[in-house]
Regions:
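Conserved active-site and cofactor/substrate-binding residues in soluble primary-metabolism enzymes
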Residues: 2, 16-23, 27, 43, ...
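Adenosine-phosphate binding glycine-rich loop
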Residues: 2-19, 24, 220, 332-444
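Flexible, glycine/charged-enriched surface loops at secondary-structure junctions
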Residues: 19-22, 38-45, 119, 156-165, ...
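Structured beta-strand/loop patches that form or line metal/cofactor-binding pockets in enzymes
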Residues: 41-71
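Glycine/serine-rich phosphate-binding loop and adjoining beta1-alpha1 elements at the start
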Residues: 96, 115-229
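Glycine-rich phosphate/diphosphate-binding loop of Rossmann-like nucleotide-binding domains
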Residues: 193-196, 201-310
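Rossmann-like adenosine-cofactor binding region
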Residues: 264-362, 367
Length: 444
């Protein structure tokens, strides 16, 4: 059995009932075979793959809080500090009922490579809770966030671990979390990113993941002799990533025609009305079914099916494993030329392989959605310097970071004879930097 197969088997055995984590490890290690085989003796001796797939620290804790009826509720909190070889742990917090240790480990593992790809000095981590913010009052969300931070504060710090937002954690939640951290610690430091502009946040942070996704898509298409302008795009999701991906798509001359939420999806052949979408999701916090009140000629469909829409480009921006094999077949049949992941691992392994085998250009989330964490790191820099950069400065830095990420992964793929395979390129480019740092720092 090869070293890669041994480590994959160990991960599955030691981490039962964590399919998302198994999937993430398998996808990364399979694509690293060519590098591992060239360095197998050294990697085995130093147990590099075992150390890479085992988090440095896994924290689980109880989160008690009181709802508006006076009833005590209890949720579980998580923080997985996966790898700090190249910098302090950095990664978001996710509040969603599906959250468990396996999902947080998969997200933290992916974050290690994503953060490495940015070229910035940040390690990988992830956290969250099975708390569901949907349907909760502001007071209940504040109570939960304060209780969550009352334990989490012990494990984080501006030079140790800097969380950010993710699904279910936006500006409101970051504000409540930051307020409680400051109250407990009595220090004003950049311990969270995604903060409000009045208390240390960065301009362009909210837009960064969606904008970065489109900068990556444009650069990848350009490398392949294709113009983004004039293309039609399927976008899934209706949160932060999707909304600002749609906004930047319009700015770059493309036409996004869909959006989705947990109940259904919209198809607007004239192009999604961005202002209507923002009002529904950011102001009203309502369901997408409201959209047809703004645009009577648009279609609303309950359930799934967005990948059946005919378009040139697909941008999955909702959640893990949303794009499955049958969806990939529909995309190929409809002539899609590129898929770029705005969410974390939204495409299953089988779907990814099918897309690649059928000549679809494919950029994985760890590269395509790295704009969010890159701009979080820029927020950390501004906090450290006690400065605030303009929107244009941050956006220009973000654009250059995304261009650099693409060319780094493109070069890595070509170096190992895998030209055009951006999954392999992203994993190799992220892996090499982390492994070099781990080796230099010894067995720790």
């Amino acid at each position: 059995m090869s070293y890669v197969d041994e480590v994959i088997a160990q991960v599955v055995e030691k981490n039962p009932v964590q399919p998302e984590f198994h999937q993430a490890v398998k996808e990364v290690l399979e694509s690293l075979r060519v590098v591992v085989e060239a360095n197998e003796e050294e990697f085995r001796k130093n147990a590099l793959l075992e150390r890479l797939t085992n988090p440095e620290r896994q924290i689980m804790f109880r989160v008690p809080w009181v709802d508006d009826k006076g009833q005590v509720q209890v949720n579980t909190g998580f923080r997985v500090q996966f790898n700090s070889a190249i910098g302090p742990y950095k990664g978001g917090l996710r509040f969603h009922p599906s959250v468990n240790l396996g999902i947080i480990k998969f997200l933290g593992f992916e974050q290690v490579f994503k953060n490495s790809l940015t070229g910035l000095p940040i390690g990988g981590g992830k956290g969250g809770s099975d708390f569901d913010p949907k349907g909760k009052s502001d007071r209940e969300i504040m109570a939960f966030c304060q209780s969550f931070m009352t334990e989490l504060y012990r494990h984080i710090g501006a030079d140790t671990d800097v969380p950010a937002g993710d699904i279910g954690v936006g500006g409101r939640e970051i504000g409540y979390l930051y307020g409680q951290y400051k109250r407990i610690r009595g220090v004003y430091e950049g311990v969270l990113t995604g903060k409000g502009l009045t208390y240390g946040g960065s301009l362009a942070r909210k837009e960064a993941t969606g904008y970065g996704l489109l900068y990556m898509t444009r650069e990848m298409l350009k490398e392949n002799g294709i113009e983004l302008a004039g293309k039609t795009a399927i976008v899934s999701g209706a949160g932060n990533v999707a909304i600002y991906a749609i906004e930047k798509a319009y700015q770059l001359g493309a036409k996004p025609v869909t959006a989705t939420d947990s109940t259904g999806w919209i198809y607007d052949p004239e192009g999604v009305d961005l202002e209507a979408l923002k009002e529904i999701k950011e102001v009203k916090r309502a369901r997408l079914s409201e959209y047809t009140k703004y645009r009577p000629n648009a279609e609303y469909h309950e359930g799934k099916g967005v990948w059946s829409v005919k378009a040139d480009i697909a941008l999955p921006c909702a959640t893990q494993n949303e794009l499955q094999l049958e969806d990939a077949k529909a995309l190929v049949a409809n002539g899609v030329i590129a898929v770029c992941e705005g969410a974390n691992m939204p495409t299953t392994l089988e779907a990814t392989q099918y897309l690649q085998e059928n000549g679809v250009l494919f950029v994985p989330g760890k590269a395509a959605n790295a704009g969010g964490v890159a701009t979080s790191a820029l927020e950390m820099s501004q906090n450290s310097e006690r400065l605030s950069w303009t929107f244009e400065e941050v956006d220009a830095k973000l654009q250059q970071i995304m261009i650099n990420i693409f060319h780094n992964l493109d070069d890595a793929a070509k170096k190992y004879g895998k030209a055009g395979n951006y999954v392999v390129g992203a994993n190799i480019a992220g892996f090499e930097k982390v492994v070099d740092a781990m080796t230099a720092q010894g067995i720790v």
